[in-house]
Amino acid sequence: MIRLSLIIPTYNRARQLLAALESVVRQDMPAGEWECVVVNNNSTDDTAARFAAFAARYPALNLRMVTETDPGVSYARNRGIAETSAPYMAFIDDDERINAGFIRAYVEFFDAHPDAVVAGGRIIAEYVSGRPAWMSKYSELPVANPMDFGHAVRPFPAGRVPGGGNMAFRRSATARYGGFDPSLGRVGGMLIGGEENDFFERMM
């Protein structure tokens, strides 16, 4: 039984996506209890072909790709929600890597906290050649969206919500509150945000 669906929207970042998937296939959760659904948001590069070749290497895992033709991360996330049925859903971005216990941690959290609807975790920015000199502690938040409140399970600080690169929620939440607002969120190279804040504010 699939207990959690990991959803990864992607657009024209085949190389980064494959690096993310390399971390996904190392999950320590039994393969029959999770799936990974990549939402191809009309990529024009070789994302589809490279994903197919990658997935063929892991026939025992539930790896699949679906397509969303309307551009924008909100449309892509909503497509991922529509194409899955697991009671729990988690989202990461296509340029991230997750640790081996990522999926198991979310499943165990929701199992242990039946009243919890939403959860989020650490997002640690990694810079290829060091933190850019122009980036201040103020500009890093909207650009890299780092988030680190430690390892302990606790409520999110007042005024903060999970980041889109590491968030999870119960499927029942989307049935009650709807999905992501397509008028918000990144579209192609346009770094428009706000879709996560809007989504979580509807739940509060």
Regions found by a protein language model. Give the residues of each.
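A short, conserved alpha-helix in the catalytic core of glycosyltransferases
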Residues: G164-F169, A173-G178, G185-M204
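A conserved acidic beta->alpha catalytic loop
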Residues: S23, N40-R50, E96
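Cell-envelope/extracellular polymer assembly enzymes that use nucleotide-activated donors
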Residues: I2-S5, E35, D198
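Conserved donor NDP-sugar-binding/catalytic core segment of glycosyltransferases
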Residues: G101-M135
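Short, flexible, basic/aromatic active-site loop/helix in glycosyltransferases
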Residues: G121, Y138-R160
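Glycine-rich, basic loop-to-helix element that forms the pyrophosphate-binding segment
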Residues: E68-T84, A105
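N-proximal low-complexity "stem/linker" segments adjacent to membrane-targeting elements
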Residues: M1-R26
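Short aromatic/hydrophobic "clamp" motif used to bind/position activated sugar donors
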Residues: M89
